[in-house]
Swiss-Prot record:
Pfam families: HCS_D2 (PF22617), HMGL-like (PF00682), LeuA_dimer (PF08502). Its cofactor is Mn(2+). This is 2-isopropylmalate synthase. It catalyses: 3-methyl-2-oxobutanoate + acetyl-CoA + H2O = (2S)-2-isopropylmalate + CoA + H(+). HAMAP family: LeuA_type1. Residues 391-509 are annotated as: Regulatory domain. GO terms for cellular component: cytoplasm. Residues 5-267 form the Pyruvate carboxyltransferase domain. It comes from Staphylococcus aureus (strain NCTC 8325 / PS 47). Mn(2+) binds at residues 14, 202, 204, 238. Pathway: Amino-acid biosynthesis; L-leucine biosynthesis; L-leucine from 3-methyl-2-oxobutanoate: step 1/4. InterPro entries: 2-IPM_HCS-like, 2-isopropylmalate_synth_dimer, Aldolase_TIM, LeuA/HCS_post-cat, LeuA_allosteric_dom_sf, LeuA_bact_synth, PYR_CT.
C-alpha cells in the first residue's frame, strides 16, 4: 500500500517572489480556491507581517477555504507569529511556519548571531507559537549549508519546543540528491520525540535539481513536499509540484508513495497560475507544456497510433488535457457554446455566458474555427477585465508624420467614470502607452513586453504580457485580442489598474 505524501503549496508566498509577479487580492483568492480543488494539503498563503496586503489576503483565504490547511510564514519574532495567528485564526486548519537561518554564512553576515543565540531563539519562539497553534512548522533556513551536527541540534530544539513539522530548505538550490536524502535520514534517526514528526522538503532549482532532490528526500524519510505550481519562485524557481506528483504516480513501483492530488485538475491549475503570474509555460515543460503529449517524429506517431504506451508513460487525460477537441464555428449556437464551456470544466452563470457568447461570435466571424484554446483565452480575457478596477473602452490611432503616431485612449472604471487622453510617439505602442500614462498620471518604465499567439495561423488571437515599474513597484498586465495593438493597450491598462488597486488610488482628468 502506498504511503501518503503531503503537498505543501507555497505558490502564493515563495512563488510570488518571482521577479515581476505580483498577484492581486482577487487573484490570490482564486488561486487558493483552485489549489484546494486540486487537493493540496497545506497552502502557505503569505507572510502576514510583511504588509497589510499580505495580511488581508491570508485572512481572506483562511476564512474562505473549507478543507485545506492555511499557513502563514513568520520569522522568529513574536510580532510575526501574532500576525499569523490573527490572519489564520478563522481557518479550518491554521498553521504557523516559523523560520530562522542556521548556516554559518547567514549567522555571520545576516543575523550576526552565535549558534547558542540561534538555539535560544528557536526554543523561545517555537514555544510561543505552540501556545497559539496546534500545528507548528519549523524551518532552519539554508539547512543544506548548515553543519549537520548543528542542524540536528536546531531540529531537536524545535521538536522539544513543540514543532511537529520540520521543513529542511535547500534555500539556494545547493544540494544534490544523495546529500539531501542523507540529511533526512540523519534527522529521522537522530532526533527523538514522543510525538509523530513530519519531515518536509523545500527545494530550489538553482542547479536544476529541485524535483530530483524532492524525490530523494522522500527516499530519505520526508513525508511532505513543498513547492510551487509550474516551479515559479525566486531566481531559478522552486520544485514544480505537478512534476513531483506525477513522478510519484507513474513510478509508484519505486517510491511506493502517492499524493492526494486530484490529478485531473493539474493542467487547469497550471494554466491559472501561468495566466495570473504572466509567465508562459514553456512548450516543452514536463506534464503541463503544450508539447508534453505531442509526437512529431513519424516513427513516434506510428507507434502511438498503434499503441499509446509505446511513447507515452501517462495519458493526457490524467492531468486534465482533452484529446478529443470539437472546434466551434460561426454557425454554432448558444447551446453548443454552453456545452463546450461545461466540457472544458467551467461553471459559469447564464448572465456571464451571454457576454462570453458575444465575444465568441465576434471571434468566430474572423476565424474558420474556434478552438478550445480560443475559448480558454476568451474566458481568461473576460476574467481579467471583470476583476480590473479600470478597463480599456476605446482606442483610436492615426498616422501623423515622419514615423510619428497619435493615440487616443479611453478608459472606464468600475463606477462607469470615463477617462480620456491622447499622445504621440515613435510608433503605435509608444503612442498608446504614453496616452495611458497620462490618464493615470504616472511615470512608468516598461521592463518587459511579450506577444504570444493563442493558436497557430494568421487569424490567431494575440496575448500580450507587460511588466511595468511604477514608483519602484513591479506590476504585470495581461491583454488578449485579435488586434495586437488592442491587446497591448489592454495589458498596459491592466498593469496600471493593478497598481491603482493595490494603492487604493483614483486617476485624474
Amino acid at each position: 500500500m502506498s504511503s501518503h505524501i503531503q503537498i505543501f503549496d507555497t505558490t502564493l508566498r515563495d512563488g510570488e517572489q518571482t521577479p515581476g509577479v505580483n498577484f492581486t487580492f482577487d487573484e490570490r483568492l482564486r488561486i487558493a480556491l483552485q489549489l484546494e480543488k486540486w487537493g493540496v494539503d497545506v497552502i502557505e498563503a503569505g507572510f502576514p507581517a510583511s504588509s497589510t496586503g499580505s495580511f488581508k489576503s491570508v485572512q481572506a483565504i483562511a476564512q474562505t477555504l473549507t478543507t485545506t490547511a492555511v499557513c502563514g510564514l513568520a520569522r522568529c519574532k513574536k510580532s510575526d507569529i501574532d500576525a499569523v495567528y490573527e490572519a489564520t485564526k478563522d481557518a479550518a486548519k491554521p498553521v504557523v511556519h516559523v523560520f530562522i537561518a542556521t548556516s554559518p554564512i547567514h549567522l555571520e553576515h545576516k543575523l550576526k548571531m552565535s549558534q547558542e543565540d540561534v538555539l535560544a531563539s528557536i526554543k523561545e519562539h517555537v514555544t510561543y507559537a505552540k501556545q497559539l497553534f496546534d500545528v507548528v512548522q519549523f524551518s532552519p533556513e539554508d539547512a543544506t549549508r548548515t553543519e549537520l551536527p548543528f542542524l540536528v541540534k536546531c531540529v531537536q530544539t524545535a521538536v522539544d519546543a513543540g514543532a511537529t513539522v520540520i521543513n529542511i530548505p535547500d534555500t539556494v538550490g545547493y544540494s544534490y540528491h544523495d546529500e539531501y536524502a542523507h540529511i533526512f535520514k540523519t534527522l529521522t534517526e537522530s532526533v527523538t520525540s514522543s510525538n509523530e514528526i513530519i519531515y518536509s522538503a523545500h527545494c530550489h532549482d538553482d542547479l536544476g535539481m529541485a524535483v530530483s532532490n524532492s524525490l530523494a528526500a522522500i527516499e530519505g524519510g520526508a513525508r511532505r513536499i513543498e513547492g510551487t505550481v509550474n516551479g515559479i519562485g525566486e531566481r531559478a524557481g522552486n520544485a514544480a509540484l505537478e512534476e513531483v506528483a506525477l513522478a510519484l504516480y507513474v513510478r509508484n513501483d519505486h517510491y511506493g508513495a502517492q499524493t492526494a492530488l486530484n490529478l485531473e485538475e493539474t493542467k487547469k491549475t497550471s494554466d491559472l497560475i501561468s495566466r495570473y503570474a504572466g509567465i508562459r509555460v514553456p512548450r516543452n515543460k514536463a506534464i503541463v507544456g503544450q508539447n508534453a503529449f505531442s509526437h512529431e517524429s513519424g516513427i513516434h506517431q506510428d507507434g502511438v497510433l498503434k499503441h499509446r504506451e509505446t511513447y507515452e508513460i501517462m495519458t493526457p487525460q490524467l492531468v486534465g488535457v482533452s484529446t478529443t477537441e470539437l472546434p466551434l464555428g460561426k454557425l454554432s449556437g448558444k447551446h453548443a457554446f454552453s456545452e463546450k464551456l461545461k466540457a472544458l470544466g467551467y461553471d459559469i452563470d447564464k448572465e456571464a455566458q451571454i457576454d462570453l457568447f458575444k465575444q465568441f461570435k465576434a471571434i468566430a466571424d474572423k476565424k474558420k474555427s474556434v478552438s478550445d484554446r480560443d475559448i480558454h483565452a476568451i474566458i481568461q480575457g473576460s476574467e481579467h477585465e471583470h476583476q480590473a478596477l479600470y478597463k480599456l473602452e476605446t482606442l483610436q490611432l492615426q498616422y501623423v508624420s515622419s514615423g510619428l503616431q497619435s493615440a487616443v485612449v479611453v478608459v472606464k472604471d468600475k463606477e462607469g467614470h470615463i477617462y480620456q487622453d491622447s499622445s504621440i510617439g515613435t510608433g503605435s505602442i509608444v503612442a498608446i502607452y504614453n496616452a495611458v500614462d497620462r490618464i493615470f498620471q504616472k511615470e512608468t518604465e516598461l521592463i518587459d513586453y511579450r506577444i504570444n499567439s493563442v493558436t497557430e495561423g494568421t487569424d490567431a488571437q494575440a496575448e500580450v504580457h507587460v511588466n511595468l515599474l511604477i514608483e519602484g513597484k513591479t506590476v504585470n498586465g495581461f491583454g488578449i485580442d485579435h488586434d495586437i495593438l488592442q491587446a497591448s493597450c489592454k495589458a498596459y491598462v491592466e498593469a496600471h489598474a493593478k497598481f491603482a488597486a493595490e494603492n487604493v488610488e483614483k486617476v485624474g482628468n
